Amino acid sequence: MAKLDFDRSKPHVNIGTIGHVDHGKTTLTAAIATVLAKKGLAEARDYASIDNAPEEKARGITINTSHIEYQTEKRHYAHVDCPGHADYVKNMITGAAQMDGAILVVAATDGPMPQTREHILLARQVGVPKIVVFLNKIDMFKDDEREEMVGLVEMDVRSLLSEYGFDGDNAPIIAGSALKALQGDPEYEKGILELMDAVDTYIEEPKRETDKPFLMAVEDVFTITGRGTVATGRVERGVLQLNEEVEIVGLKPTKKTVVTGIEMFRKNLKEAQAGDNAGLLLRGIDRSEVERGQVLAKPKTIVPHTQFEATVYVLKKEEGGRHTPFFHNYKPQFYFRTTDVTGGIEFKPGREMVVPGDNVELTVTLIAPIAIEEGTKFSIREGGRTVGAGSVTKILK
């Protein structure tokens, strides 16, 4: 079958399904694609094609993820669904699939379960802004008890969302049956369309990366005789015009400079923007004053820090991680953007050790200041291999 041409004039939004194992995340993902396919807005998908998720690597970690795309009348969506619970944890912490919003799937027959809670907490920690809820499997109730049971589960879900800092009072909650919709039952197909209307209106369009303040991590530095020092790297966000000021942040005291040349693939440019691999010529900066691991950023938009709280996933032995637990004062390398910095780890009170496979909250103290902010992603490495992945949740100093 020919691939659909997606209409790029529609705003693009990244979403994903989250929730407890067997509550119907993958069935719902298939149902959304299948129902929208009837309007010519998606390719119909069956459960197996989504469940059989390909392996991906992000920050040295293997993750199984299914990506599907579809449209509504208003938007173009990229939707991520993970087969296993550990895949969700890894995916969200590494930022492999950024989510602008999530659809939380809760089986109305069970109500919220342990992973429901864990996924909501993870969504909060990694900065997913909005959650829409789908109460699944309502076809399992007898007609006369359905309304009451759905109402009870809805109350539980709202209080759980509020507990973790989401807007439990106003989050849209749609009840339905993903399986019945996937099988083509018109009554239940309506529920899927209602869900997508809620996603269209409640989940906000993300700010484009180009609208954010300029930031580029330095990968390499060299000197051009007679012209000066050039720093190269990939622009993470924002736009930089020729002759604008930037700050060199991290590892050393922050310095200001002016970008007097922007080069990409040996061509001179007037600006560099998010996604570009660029070389920036820095006025009055000596080769020794800028190094890999620093960032070039719009002045006063990012500051170097040495201490922060983070949520971290520690790889299992089978994933290439450590074979043994680690304890207080473990001092691995923290890999931010383009460089490793040694840091010490402290646990939350009451925890003695961290075992491979754990998802844990830690306090980290780096030996050198690095340009970081809430939401910055990092890997934890030991002897050059990745043993964990994390996301900064709170800056301490």
Swiss-Prot record:
Main location: cytoplasm
Stated name of the protein: Elongation factor Tu
Gene3D superfamilies reported in the protein's UniProt record: P-loop containing nucleotide triphosphate hydrolases, Translation factors
Binding-site residues for GTP, renumbered to this chain: 19-26, 81-85, 136-139
Binding positions for Mg(2+) per the UniProt entry: 26
GO molecular function: GTP binding; GTPase activity; translation elongation factor activity
Main function: GTP hydrolase that promotes the GTP-dependent binding of aminoacyl-tRNA to the A-site of ribosomes during protein biosynthesis.
Region feature G2, mapped onto this chain: 60-64
Lineage per the UniProt record: Bacteria, Bacillati, Mycoplasmatota, Mycoplasmoidales, Metamycoplasmataceae
Record keyword Magnesium present: yes
Region called G5, residue ranges: 177-179
Residues in tr-type G domain copies: 10-207
Record organism: Metamycoplasma hominis (strain ATCC 23114 / DSM 25592 / NBRC 14850 / NCTC 10111 / PG21) (Mycoplasma hominis)
Region ranges (G1): 19-26
NCBIfam families: EF-Tu (TIGR00485), PRK00049.1 (NF000766), PRK12735.1 (NF009372), PRK12736.1 (NF009373), small_GTP (TIGR00231)
Oligomer and partners: Monomer.
Family in the record: Belongs to the TRAFAC class translation factor GTPase superfamily. Classic translation factor GTPase family. EF-Tu/EF-1A subfamily.
Region forming the signal peptide: none
The keyword Magnesium appears for this protein: yes
Keyword entries, A-Z: Cytoplasm, Elongation factor, GTP-binding, Hydrolase, Magnesium, Metal-binding, Nucleotide-binding, Protein biosynthesis
EC number: 3.6.5.3
Region (G3): 81-84
Subcellular location: Cytoplasm
Catalytic activity: GTP + H2O = GDP + phosphate + H(+)
